[in-house]
Design a protein with these regions (language model features):
Chain A
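Thiamine diphosphate
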Residues: 1-143, 196-197, 325, 329-350
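Conserved active-site and cofactor/substrate-binding residues in soluble primary-metabolism enzymes
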Residues: 39-44, 56, 87, 91, ...
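Glycine-rich ThDP/TPP pyrophosphate-binding loop and its adjacent helix/strand module
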Residues: 116-117, 121-132, 137, 141-283
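Short catalytic-loop micro-motif centered on adjacent basic/acidic residues
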Residues: 34, 107-109, 183-188
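Short coil/turn connectors at secondary-structure junctions
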Residues: 28, 55-59, 78-80, 99-105, ...
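Flexible, low-complexity linker and terminal segments
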Residues: 2-18, 219-350
Length: 350, 599
């Protein structure tokens, strides 16, 4: 068994604006089961952060508990990391973000971590609009504890030993839309062409960006009868659009037919260009997105792509009017303004 | 692209770059692993079967394998394949008992070999082991050919030649006729040999044709003749100031020999540019390290002499100019000529073939360059029972080519003597075996060392220049050899893909440290090469293409910079990738694949 990936790399490996190669964004070698979809998502995160030329130390990666939540060890080895408690990534991340808004926050979670034990935390983070990228590596089971159905498991889906799930699934995408997330996407670990730009768009989004990424569990949920297997997802995947992320006004090229492109400029200047694959889908209309999702779900389709985007999001700091400077850069006087200041606040609340 | 054809060994053989590039197709990674395991004798025997002279070649081989070595494409320098071979030779134990026995019962066929260089000796070994009676003729007093008469002792000690020539001539089946110059091929054929192998080399040194050459003849020497005299001990001194003309390996041996025989101011002068010189880079380095300057772009114009004694040489300064077709011409710069004083000149400007002893009316045809007309594969001449090899076949090459020719000629001679078609060649012997030992365990060391190439230790220069018999290179000790051996990427441990098992999870794509693997839509090769995870720009390396995947895509692996680390196979959930050791041995008359065993 190899514990180290050789540092030798392709002689033509390109570098980004920082002079770093993609390999500089990797973490330690994965200990997940070979073939786990989560590893592909890690690779997509590496690719996306490298392409954006983000200095690794500007990223904070936080997670809960589960195979998915282990993955931050396997990417961005030079970033900040916090492996929290089961289902509690959202609150820890919210705290971190309040203390230092200058980092780029990436929360990695599982369907068990977010839709079962952590559902409450998930909901409140979405409502509050914490500026972050929230990725759920969704395999429909508790992989780490050997494959029990999770709350995203489809009704009727079969477990490896034959048991059938009788409970209704939670659709985290619908929930995120409902709860006010300002960037909502779904993707598949087996389609990096789609996933990498979605992660880039999420990282540049200045509000809460949620990606539900279906990620087959090869050990416990990749069999016939599962609705989260590689084969099932490939067969039922309906992409609504293909996203490209630009940082300049690259002219629309011939590969896009006129009228087929939706463009959204985000707050940081990034340009999201979506090539429409479905006529009746409008990614800037939240209600329409919810309807669209419900309609296609009823048809048995797994809708993927950038489903909703609000180019002018507000985040938690906007709502609270907090100071822009990270707390660790404020001096004692600013952090602890004294009893006179406290008196003033109390008086205002009386 | 069409899926890669794995029914022939070609694809996987090419992946083992070193073995593919070796004219004798030595199974390099196998012997390197054996060296790492301390199994020097086993490593020696693998070499002995393939290249016959491991101790000699481990010091002198032209090493076409090294520029081909994959390691040189993922870091700075290739594995020191050649010098590791010497480690096997230096550290081996008794080997005679491991060599196949020479049959006591002869097959009744008699073969004559003209010359006792590496080509003839290879023919003799391969055929003697099959029960042939082989007669080897050489004009010199010992076997070895140029290995003995030309290559200086400071690069190749006599004991090594004696030992390895002895493994051929000293075990029966081979009758040597030394001090015997063959004067007539016709007469030789008349002696009733079943076949004759001509391995007489390219024995004539090219002449220098400038004014003053004849007048100063006493101090102007043809390089290969001079080296032979040095080798025999007939020449023991040279003047203090020596000019060596020529840019090949012979020039390098001349100048370094001169440094050891009293030459204090020795310089090499070449017509062309330094970069274009024929000498191997390491030979040039060795010469310059010994204080020998190499002066380039100087064309010999005149020899200066006084009273029949050489005093110096005049050179014209030239520069390289390229015409519209990109051909290089050397044109005078117009600067004044330069003169170098000297006491001796060694002329090493090329070698030529000469076959004065072969009659032109016996049916053996020559081409217009004076070389025999041969079938390039069988080495058969226009006389069906006469075969050529080594420098005599296609002009001067090197030892390993002579050996490779020897093997092929032996196969041809054997087929010929059996009355079979010499063009119907026996297949190489090929084995593929999975290296899987456990879930993530391999029977080879798949960790990739990141060490840079280790230098071979040299003897102190003071001692080296004092005596021409002192070998300059000391060779790797066991510890250095181990470390150098670990640099080998085990390119023979092949990544073998089974599309039926693949679930297209991308695990292998993500883990590959050198971005070799892509799953994509099929297309024409030119197009496909641009669409891979890393563009496949090295056209000399093949793509491995497999179809039969569920999504209808193809798996494309660019073999170019694969580290053979096995990570793809470790990260594959279904065993669609397997690491399999590919072992290929070319057919030898006496061993696997030979007609003798097959019929
Ligand atoms: C100075 C020098 C240095 C070299 N260094 C290297 C090196 O480091 N590495 C390398 O790989 N190669 C080297 N070479 C080249 C290498 O020596 C030859 O390519 C190789 O020896 C050719 O082998 P062969 O069997 O064809 O013939 P040779 O080795 O040339 O042997 C031919 C033999 O045939 C004999 N012979 C010729 N005519 C007759 C006849 N009519 N009757 C009887 N005997 C005859 C000759 O006496 C000679 O012994 C070097 C060559 C030179 C000149
Ligand atoms: C508080 C608490 N309850 C239960 C567990 C046991 N546990 C560990 S991981 C896990 C489920 C993880 O599922 P998911 O988030 O889908 O991750 P996956 O392994 O499938 O990627 C559970 C229930 C725990 N670690 N902590
Ligand atoms: S148990 Fe499932 S989710 Fe966990 S590592 Fe294995 S394949 Fe991935
Ligand atoms: S790395 Fe080893 S096996 Fe590969 S080409 Fe070089 S010597 Fe041969
Ligand atoms: S790891 Fe195995 S199953 Fe997965 S894509 Fe590669 S070969 Fe196919
Ligand atoms: Mg899960």
């Amino acid at each position: 068994m190899s514990y180290l990936k050789p540092t030798l790399h392709h002689p033509k490996l390109p570098t980004n604006a920082l002079g770093l190669t993609r390999r500089d964004y990797e973490g330690s070698i994965s200990t997940l089961c070979a073939g786990c979809g989560h590893d592909s998502i890690s690779a997509a995160i590496v690719q996306a952060v490298w392409e954006l030329s983000i200095p690794p130390h500007r990223v904070a990666k936080l997670s809960g508990i589960g195979c998915s939540s282990k993955t931050p060890d396997y990417f961005l080895g030079a970033s900040h990391g916090f492996n929290s408690v089961h289902g509690r990534m959202p609150s820890v991340l919210t705290g971190a973000n309040l203390a230092n808004r200058e980092l780029i926050y990436l929360g990695v979670s599982g369907d068990g971590d977010s839709a079962s034990i952590g559902l409450g935390q998930f909901a409140h983070l979405m409502r509050r609009g914490v500026n972050m990228t929230y990725i759920v590596e969704n395999n429909g089971v508790y992989g780490l504890t050997k494959g029990q159905f999770s709350a995203t498991s489809d009704k009727g889906s079969k477990a490896k030993k034959g048991a059938v799930n009788t409970d209704e699934p939670i659709d985290l995408v619908a929930l995120a839309l409902e709860l006010g997330a300002t960037y909502v996407a779904r993707s598949f670990s087996g389609d990096k062409d789609q996933l990498v730009p979605l992660i880039k768009g999420a990282l540049t989004h200045q509000g809460v960006a949620f990606i539900d990424c279906i990620s087959p569990c090869v050990a416990f949920n990749n069999h016939e009868g599962s609705t989260k297997s590689y084969d099932y997802v490939r067969e039922h995947n309906e992409a609504v659009n293909r996203l490209d992320v630009f940082f300049d006004r690259t002219p629309i090229t011939a590969s896009y037919a006129p009228g087929e492109v939706t463009e959204v400029t985000q707050h940081d200047g990034s340009l999201l260009r979506m090539r429409k694959l479905h006529e009746d889908h409008d990614p800037t209309d939240r209600v329409a997105a919810l309807n669209y999702l419900a309609r296609h779900k009823a048809m048995g389709e797994i809708v993927t792509g950038l489903l909703y985007i609000d180019p002018h999001p507000e985040d938690l700091h906007d709502h609270l009017g907090t100071v822009a400077t990270p707390l660790n850069r404020l001096d004692d006087a600013a952090l602890c303004p004294g009893s006179a200041a406290l008196e003033k606040i109390n008086a205002a609340l009386r | 692209m069409r899926p890669t054809d794995l029914t022939t060994p070609t694809h996987f053989h090419k992946v083992v770059d070193c073995q593919w590039a070796c004219p004798a197709h030595t199974p390099v990674p196998e012997y390197i692993r054996l060296i790492a395991a301390g199994r020097y004798t086993d490593a020696y025997m693998i070499n002995w079967h393939s290249n016959v002279f491991p101790g000699i070649l481990g010091r002198t081989c032209d090493r076409p394998c090294e520029p081909a070595c994959r390691r040189g494409r993922v870091e700075e320098e290739p594995v020191a394949i050649c010098r590791l071979k010497r480690v096997a030779a230096d550290n081996k134990e008794e080997v005679l008992s491991r060599m196949p026995p020479v049959p006591a019962l002869k097959n009744g066929k008699r073969i004559a070999c003209v010359g006792a260089g590496p080509a003839s000796l290879t023919v003799a070994r391969d055929l003697a082991l099959l029960g042939y009676e082989v007669h080897v003729y050489d004009a010199e007093a010992r076997g070895g050919g140029f290995m003995w008469t030309q290559i200086p002792r400071f690069r190749l000690p006599e004991s090594v030649i004696e030992e390895e020539v002895g493994y051929i001539t000293g075990r029966g089946g081979v009758v040597t006729h030394y001090n015997h110059r063959v004067q007539s091929l016709k007469a030789l054929l008349d002696e009733g040999f079943d076949a004759v192998f001509v391995g007489c080399g390219a024995p004539r040194g090219r002449e220098l044709d400038v004014p003053g050459r004849q007048e100063a003849a006493a101090n102007i020497h043809i390089g290969i003749e001079w080296l032979a005299k040095v080798s025999f001990g007939h020449v023991e001194r040279v003047g203090k100031r020596v000019i060596v003309l020529g840019g090949g390996n012979t020039a390098m041996d001349c100048c370094r020999s001169a440094r050891r025989l009293g030459g204090e101011d020795v310089k090499v002068i070449v017509r062309s540019g330094f970069e274009e010189m024929k000498a191997s880079p390491w030979e040039k380095e060795d010469a310059m390290r010994e204080g020998i300057p190499i002066l380039n772009y100087l064309v010999p114009k005149r020899v200066l002499h006084e009273n029949g004694r050489l005093t110096g040489m005049v050179f014209e300064k030239v520069k390289a100019e390229y015409d519209a077709k990109g051909r290089r011409n050397l044109v005078p710069t117009g600067e004044p000529d330069v003169t170098y004083d000297c006491d001796d000149v060694l002329v090493a400007i090329g070698q030529e073939n000469a076959f004065p002893w072969i009659e032109r009316d016996i049916g053996l045809e020559f081409d217009r360059w004076g070389l025999p007309k041969l079938d390039p594969v069988t080495l058969q001449s226009t006389l069906p029972n006469v075969f050529f090899g080594g420098d005599a076949a296609f002009g001067p090459k090197n030892i390993i080519w002579a050996v490779a020719h020897g093997h092929e000629a032996a196969v041809s001679i054997d087929l010929h003597c059996r009355g079979e078609d010499v063009r119907d060649r026996p297949d190489p012997h090929v084995r593929m075996a999975s290296q899987k030992m456990g879930i993530h365990e391999w029977s080879y060391d798949n960790d990739v060392s990141i060490d840079l190439r280790y230098k071979v230790p040299h003897v102190e220069e003071r001692l080296a220049l004092r005596d021409i018999r002192v070998e300059v290179e000391l060779g790797y000790d066991r510890e250095l050899a181990y470390k150098e051996a670990q640099r080998c990427l085990n390119c023979d441990v092949q990544t073998v893909f089974n599309a039926k098992l693949c679930i297209e999870c991308d695990g292998c794509v993500d883990i590959c440290p050198t971005d070799c693997i892509t799953f994509t839509e099929n297309g024409e090769e030119d197009d496909l090469r641009t669409r891979l995870k890393a563009p496949a720009i090295n056209r000399s390396q093949d793509l491995y293409v497999a179809d039969g995947l569920k999504t209808g895509r193809v798996m494309v692996k660019d073999e170019d910079v694969c580290l053979h680390c096995g990570l793809c196979a470790e990260r594959c959930p279904t065993g669609a990738w397997d690491m399999q050791k590919f072992y290929l041995e070319t057919a030898k008359t006496y061993a696997n694949g030979a007609r003798a065993c097959r019929s």
